[in-house]
Every structure is written in C-alpha cells, then in structure tokens.
Design a protein with these regions (language model features):
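Small-residue hotspots at the loop-to-helix junctions and early N-terminal turns
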Residues: 1-8, 83, 87, 146, ...
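Short alpha-helical transmembrane segments in multi-pass integral membrane proteins
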Residues: 28-93, 137-193, 249-314, 356-394
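Residue-level hotspots within pore-lining transmembrane alpha-helices
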Residues: 13-17, 57, 61, 91, ...
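Small-residue-rich hydrophobic transmembrane alpha-helices
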Residues: 2-60, 97-116, 223-287, 318-340
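Short runs within selected transmembrane alpha-helices of multi-pass transporters and secretion channels
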Residues: 21, 25, 89-108, 116-124, ...
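Hydrophobic transmembrane alpha-helices of multi-pass small-molecule transporters
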Residues: 12-15, 127-131, 156-161, 233-236, ...
Length: 394
C-alpha cells in the first residue's frame, strides 16, 4: 500500500521530466525534417545542459518535500515513513530519469523509434528483475523497489550512450555536447515547459482523485491502486502512438510536406481507435484475472474488477483525445494540448469529488468522472481541429 500510494507522486515527477524532453524533441524533429543538422546539434546540447541543471534542482526539491506532499495526499500515518523512504530514493535518481527520457526522445525525434522502444523494454525487464532480487532475495521491501527503479534507468542511460556512440552519427557530438546556445534556450524552455505542464496536469488530476479515493478506506485504496496500474499500463501505447504521430508530423512540418502531415495524423488516429476498441474488449472480458495479478484479497479484487470494467467503457475517448493532442503537438501548438489537459483534469476531479464526497457513491462508479473529463476535452479540441482543417493547417 505504501508503494502504491506513493506511485502517483513518483509518476508526476517522471512525467514532468518526460514532458520537458518531449517538448524539446519536437524542436529536434522540426530541425531534422528541415535538414538543419547544425541546429539539431545545438538543440540537443542546449537541452542536455539545461535539463541536467533543472533535474538536479528538481530532484533536491522533491527529496525535501516528500513528507508534506504525501501528507497532502492524506496518506495514512501508519504507512507514511515507508512511503517517504521509497519516494526519496526514487527522487534522488531523477537525473537518470531525465537522461534516459532525453536520449530516448531525441532518438525518436530523429526517426529511430525502434531503439527507444527496445531500451524501454530493457528498462522494464531490469526493473522487474531488480524488484525480484532486492525484495524477494534480499528482503529490502519498498526501499528495494525504489532502488530497482533507479538502477534500471541508470543502466539504460549507459546503454543509450553506448548505442549512440556506435550507431547514431548525428548525436556523436564529442566536445559539442558542451555547446550552450542561449538563442535556443527560450524556445526550448517554452516547448519543454508547456509539454511538461501538460503531462504534470494529467498526473496532478490523478493525485487529486487518489486523495479523494483515500477517504473510502484501505480496501478502496488497494483496489484503486491495482486498477490504476492497469490503467497506466494500458494508456502507455495510446500515449506512445500519439508521440509517434508528433514526431512524424513535426518532421514533415519542418520539411514543408503538408500532405504527409495530414496523412500521418489520420493514420495515427485510426490506430488509436483500433487500439482503444481492443483494449475495451480485453478489460471487459478479462478484468478479474488482470486485477488478480496485482492483489490477492477477494474483497479488493471484486472492487477492482468493478472499477476496471466501468473504466473500460470509456477507453475509446482517450484514444481520440491522445491522437488529437499528438497532432497539435506535431504542428507546434502545445498550448491547445495544455488547455485541453487542464480541462480534462479539472472536470474529472470535480466530478470525482461530487460523486464520492457529495453523492457518496461506491468506488466502482468513480470511472464516470473519467468519462466526464474526456468529454470536456473532446468538446474543447474538436472545434479547434475543424478550424485547423478549414484553414489548411492540417
């Protein structure tokens, strides 16, 4: 329970850093599509230097604020010390999180999405193996889980650097890694910060919902944590499809190929819808065995199954919203993605608060708040998408 209730804060920090890297990656994609190799090099080195400084400061702040942040989430006092220790170890390793996400985002921006995927798979395998070793063999508990997360990302950073040195000539910068171009810093910060805030807004909404769920008791917390882990895992492909759309569209936007931009958008949107439908079917049919992978208490499993089945009814909606956001990011309009995410989370949290704190509904009805949030997102995004198409921007 301590690890599970800490995950939203850990994910918030990781997604914030990932957002910075994603925003900078859009600039790399655009420059690469335009054939401006020198700008690509300066953009990469400037992002690396600025990101390193930011990550170290951000890491220190997160370590210092771990306890008050967990208290703000209404984490029970009996598990607070364990949760604090877990978070501090993870936060101390955020520099590795930055470099891993930065290098992976840069490779994707250059069109090498396969290598980024392979390194993600390696990181996941190392993390699982580390969990088994530190927790099951050494008996280190939550500290072992945290250490496994940090070490897996550190090892992946090393593997990324080795791979780049042998396989990615564009990124073999040598001393040029230390070139800092102040003229690029403003756009890097603008894109990176907007993207980071968009990612953070989504997670802040989840944390607020988690705090509301925490008022329902330990069983509800455990069931929600299990179902949320499934949610997070299933949303990853949707988000990665959108990221692939962003890279493809940004490269072609930089090269001035409007038709390719349009084709990339609608192809990605179709893939999102197909995946969303398949995901909905799987979670409806196999909710019980899926939830049983994470918890073994029958009462918690029953709650988690009901929650997941209700949530799965809305899975087509994030497929559409993720696809549209990927398109706007590829065109360089990150403000729309930030505004739509803020609307989504605002309506989701408000709906969750009304359902639980006012109407006193059970946990299994909570996903209705997700649907309300995604609907608000679509209502905001669709008119803007239609306008872009009418103005021949897409």
């Amino acid at each position: 329970a301590a690890v599970g209730t800490s995950n939203p804060l850990m994910t918030l920090a990781i997604l914030f850093i990932n957002g910075l890297c994603l925003g900078a990656g859009i600039l790399v994609s655009t420059a690469y599509g335009a054939g401006d190799t020198q700008r690509v090099e300066r953009q990469v080195s400037t992002t690396a230097i600025a990101g390193t400084v930011f990550s170290l400061v951000f890491s220190a702040l997160c370590v210092l604020l771990a306890t008050p942040l967990l208290r703000l989430m209404q984490v029970p006092e009996e598990i607070l010390p364990i949760a604090v220790q877990y978070l501090r170890i993870v936060f101390a390793g955020l520099i590795f999180t930055f470099f891993y996400n930065f290098l992976a985002a840069t490779m994707r921006a250059l069109g090498d999405s396969k290598s980024a995927l392979y390194f993600l798979m390696i990181s996941s395998v190392l993390n699982i193996g580390g969990d088994l070793f530190f927790v099951e063999v050494l008996g280190w508990g939550s500290e072992g889980c945290a250490l496994s997360t940090v070490l897996s990302e550190a090892l992946c950073c090393v593997l990324c650097v080795v791979y780049i040195q042998f396989k990615v000539p564009v990124l073999q910068l040598g001393r040029r890694w230390f070139v800092f171009d102040g003229s690029l810093l403003r756009s890097t910060v603008q894109y990176g910060w907007t993207s980071a805030m968009q990612q953070a807004t989504v997670q802040l909404g989840k944390i607020a919902v988690q705090a509301i769920v925490n008022t329902l008791g330990i069983n509800a917390m455990a069931a929600f944590t299990a179902a949320s882990r499934v949610d997070d895992f299933t949303y990853m492909p949707q988000q990665n499809i959108a990221h692939a759309m962003t890279t493809l569209m940004a490269q072609n936007h930089g090269a001035g190929k409007k038709e390719r931009v349009r084709q990339g958008f609608f192809c990605g949107l179709r893939i999102e819808l197909i995946y969303g439908f398949c995901l909905m079917a799987v979670c409806l049919l196999f909710a019980r065995p899926i939830i049983s992978l994470f918890v073994d208490d029958p009462a918690v499993i029953d709650l988690g199954v009901k929650f997941l089945r209700c949530a799965s009814l809305f899975y087509l909606m994030p497929g559409v919203t993720n696809g549209i956001q990927g398109g706007f990011r590829g065109l360089g309009d990150l403000k729309i993605t930030l505004n739509s995410s803020m609307l989504n989370m605002g309506f989701r949290v408000a709906a969750a608060a009304v359902l639980v704190l006012v109407l006193k509904v059970d946990l299994q009805i909570m996903p209705v708040s997700y649907g309300i949030g995604w609907l608000s997102m679509l209502v905001y995004e669709l008119p803007l998408l239609i306008r872009y198409m009418k103005e021949d921007k897409l």
